[in-house]
Amino acid sequence: MLASCSVSRQTVTRYQTLSQRVQLGLKMDQHEYNLSSSARVWRDELIVLSVQPMLGIEMVRLEATPDSIWVFDKMNRRYAAMDYASVNRMIQPNVSFRMLQELCNHPITPKKKENIEQEFVSGKHRLIVTCKFSNREYNTLQAPARTKVNKYKQVDLRTILPL
C-alpha cells in the first residue's frame, strides 16, 4: 500500500506591470510605525514604493532600478542614491532588485491575512519590516516616470533613514 502526499502550489502571476496597496509595519529599536503606501512595479525596470502616512500625502518615495536604490524625502526635498553594493555594506541580509521585485509579487491568498516579515540589521539597529498587500492590479500602468532629482538636494542615506 502506498501513502500519498499532497503538495500545495502557489501560482505567481506573470506580469509586465503591477500596482497594489501595501500596509507597512516598521519596528526599529523602541519605535513602531504603521504606514499606508502603494507599490508600483514595471517588471525588470523600476519599483516605486510611495509612503503616505497621513491623508494620502506622499512623504517618502523609494525608487529601485536594477542597479540602484533612490530614497526621496518629499517633505524636506532631499534624496539619497546608492548602488546595491553600498546599501548591502550598511544592512544585512543583502538586498537586490530581484529580491524586491519578487517580494512585490508575493502570492496573496484572499482568505488569509498573510503578512511578509523581513528583519534587517544595521550596526546597532534592528529594523523589522512587515508588509500586507491588497488591491493588486496587473498590467494597468503606463510607462514609468522617474522623480526629477533637480528639485531635491542630494544627501547621505543615513540622514534620511537612521541606519
Q: Locations of the language-model features?
A:
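C-terminal motif of bacterial Sec signal peptides marking the signal peptidase cleavage site
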Residues: 2-4
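An acidic-aromatic
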Residues: 46-97
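Hydrophobic/aromatic beta-strand elements that line small-molecule binding cavities or substrate pockets
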Residues: 36-40, 131-133
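A short, Trp-centered hydrophobic/proline-enriched beta-strand micro-motif
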Residues: 12-29
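Short beta-strand segments that buttress and anchor functional surface loops
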Residues: 22-26, 49-52, 119-123
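Bacterial signal peptide processing site
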Residues: 6-9
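C-terminal low-complexity, charged extensions that often adopt amphipathic alpha-helices
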Residues: 82-124, 155-161
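Non-transmembrane domains of secretory- and envelope-associated proteins
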Residues: 113-163
